[in-house]
Amino acid sequence: AKTPGNPRIVMALDGYGTNNKNNGFIFGGDLHGHLANYDVTLVAPISGDYAAGTYYTDYASPLDNGKTIRWETFLVQELPHYLSQYFRVPVRPHSTALVGLSMGSVGIMNLAQRFPERYSAVDSMSGFYTLSAPAQASSLAMGSALMGYRPRAMWGAWPSSQWKAHDPALNIRRY
């Protein structure tokens, strides 16, 4: 941000096409160049192999290797405090805009719906928005499995209450 202590943030979450060296919004989409004249802090986690197939959510149960996926916890609780402590970006309600691509779209839609007091805007591109539809739920589960994750570890067996709680179409009124 141009102004020190400015709480305005744009957080960009990648899709499957990301890698471990950079965020696709920066190196593939020049988001930092687009936002250069705006007084905002760009937060674009390099998620790569760490996120591909996770949909930036907290998994309901550990994976077979004992690993627990907690992207939502990181993005909502840990990252804001890290930014505050190390970059002097204050934690304020309605001060973060979310942008997501593909898998990142599912993540940002859920963040915005589950924590509406935190986020001011959402730009979601090419995601799964109706997880109550068998085809979209199957595609999401297949994407997770292709990346080596156990889809049932995410939100349980489809169509559980957790799947419904993370369905952007069913939860549209939360915005």
Residue ranges and their predicted role:
Residues 1-175:
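Non-catalytic cap/lid and distal C-terminal segments of serine-dependent acyl enzymes
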